[in-house]
């Protein structure tokens, strides 16, 4: 159902985003890979998509927290691909710290990238979706946004905000045939999470192990193609938030 469509993936040069790009490309979607700073990594991802999946793939450097930069990037994607039908908002950062010692700039940076960046991309992509008469948006939130997490008040707040944004966008855009859902990963083994083998929270995961980036990518693929699902938050967490 994604063959020949164009998917835009933010934070697509590594980790969960990279896995999502490969999954969508394997389904036949052309991919626009948005990255923050590592051009070589983004181009490596695109080259693999072209070589192994035979799809069009281009990379775009963009600070999604910048409203104007996001607008310019979407305009360039439109010029390159003509349209787009899929948006996966995966770009995210952490600036962990105890609340009493957290710097204002660390709180703002996380909210700006994780929450405002997602708003910026949805805001500028909506026009493409309306003209295409279809659209599937998937926002990558976190179980931290559902449960909270000590030392991550900024990150948890940003991810909780994504859940509210997802449901509001779903209600607003449903009459136009545009769906919006979210995936809430738990402990996923990536370069962003680092080595968590000694984290006591792992003992609370009913399945007894960390997830993999491909587990999240599979959930995204489902939501992209599930034409009668909108406004939902799909947990991929091994049962930790039950």
Task: Identify the role of each PLM range.
Residues 13-15:
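Conserved glycine-rich cofactor-binding loop
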Residues 27-44:
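Conserved glycine-rich Rossmann-like NAD(P)H-binding loop of the short-chain dehydrogenase/reductase
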Residues 98-99, 103-111, 201:
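Substrate-binding pocket helix/loop in short-chain dehydrogenase/reductase
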Residues 122, 158, 166:
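Active-site helix of classical SDR
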Residues 127, 171-175:
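Alpha-helical segment proximal to the catalytic Tyr-Lys
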Residues 134, 212-236, 241:
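C-terminal substrate-recognition "lid" of short-chain dehydrogenase/reductases
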Residues 142:
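Residue(s) in the substrate-gating loop at a strand-loop-helix junction
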């Amino acid at each position: 159902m994604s063959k020949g469509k164009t998917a835009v993936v933010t934070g697509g040069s590594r980790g969960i985003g990279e896995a999502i790009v490969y999954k969508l490309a394997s389904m036949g979607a052309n991919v626009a890979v948005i990255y923050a700073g590592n051009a070589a990594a983004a181009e490596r991802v695109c080259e693999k998509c072209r070589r192994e999946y035979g799809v069009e793939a281009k990379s775009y450097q963009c600070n999604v927290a910048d409203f104007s930069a996001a607008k310019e990037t979407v305009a360039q994607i439109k010029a390159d691909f003509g349209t787009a039908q899929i948006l996966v908002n995966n770009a995210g950062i952490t600036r962990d710290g105890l609340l009493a010692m957290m710097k204002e700039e660390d709180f703002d940076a996380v909210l700006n990238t994780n929450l405002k960046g997602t708003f910026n991309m949805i805001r500028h992509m909506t026009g493409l979706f309306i003209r295409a008469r279809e659209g599937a948006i998937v926002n990558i939130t976190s179980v931290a946004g559902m449960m909270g997490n000590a030392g991550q008040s900024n990150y948890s707040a940003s991810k909780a905000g994504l859940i509210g944004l997802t449901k509001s966008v779903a209600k607003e855009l449903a009459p136009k045939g545009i769906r919006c859902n979210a995936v809430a990963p738990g402990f996923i083994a990536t370069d962003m999470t680092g080595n968590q083998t000694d984290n006591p929270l792992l003992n609370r995961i009913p399945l007894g192990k960390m997830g993999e980036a491909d587990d999240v990518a599979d959930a995204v693929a489902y939501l992209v193609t599930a034409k009668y699902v909108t406004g939902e938050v799909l947990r991929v967490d091994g049962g930790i938030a039950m």
